[in-house]
Amino acid sequence: YEDVIYFDPSYTPRPMALNMLEYDARYPEQKTFVVNEMLSIFNKLFDMKTAGGPMFEQYFRNAVLLVLEDPESGSTLVDVSRVLADKAFRELKLSRCTNPIVVQFWREIAGKAGGEASLANIVPYITSKFDVFLSNDIMRPIVGQQKSSFQFREVMDNKKILLVNLSKGRLGDINA
């Protein structure tokens, strides 16, 4: 039984964690992989050709990268939504960010943008995509935890068995 992991997202008394932004700090280049995979997930869920576009991708990419720059102050999907909507939290993250491209984006591009590109217009457009996960009482405790309950790499390397219950009955189609 030690080689079998059973993950049932609908089991709410003690939810397992799955931080979709978690990466191995020994390999900082994984941050780009995480961002690209998240964009791929959102594309599959929302058909980003019609619901996204270059502005969505630019703000989303820089929000996730900013969150990933300082995992100690939070690096979950909840924190991505928060970094977009909460200026004080965004400033905290920026004060700890060592990526000059990300800092430049938030200080020079997003911070100074007006009209349709302003944060006031862009933020609800992006955070609305996160609401599927964050407003769901089953999913929020799973994706809002900092440390995942299991590591996919470890499962594969140690030849463990991962069983995931993705029944749509309680989770809904998008969350499954």
List where the protein language model places each region.
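P-loop NTPase motor domains
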Residues: 1-176
